[in-house]
Amino acid sequence: MTQLLLFLVALLVLGHVPSGRSEFKRCWKGQGACRTYCTRQETYMHLCPDASLCCLSYALKPPPVPKHEYE
């Protein structure tokens, strides 16, 4: 009986699977990821609500706004 109880407890403990993307919060319209550090292929855009960095791939980074030169 104790082996059956131990087996059921082990199944309950090992059967709990956390959600896969719970750590990776999204930002920048779902294209960026909130992280502590950005990878080499990413750039920092702004801060996420939890004060982590919003990392966006260089391929998805919007082009810079051109500056008007006054002559």
From Swiss-Prot:
Disulfide bonds join 27-54, 34-48, 38-55. The keyword Nucleus does not apply. It is found in: Secreted. Coiled coil: none annotated. GO terms for cellular component: extracellular region. GO terms for biological process: defense response to bacterium; innate immune response. The keyword Isomerase does not apply. Keywords: Antibiotic, Antimicrobial, Defensin, Disulfide bond, Secreted, Signal. Residues 1-22 form the signal peptide. It comes from the Eukaryota. Belongs to the beta-defensin family. Has antibacterial activity. This is Beta-defensin 124. The gene is DEFB124.
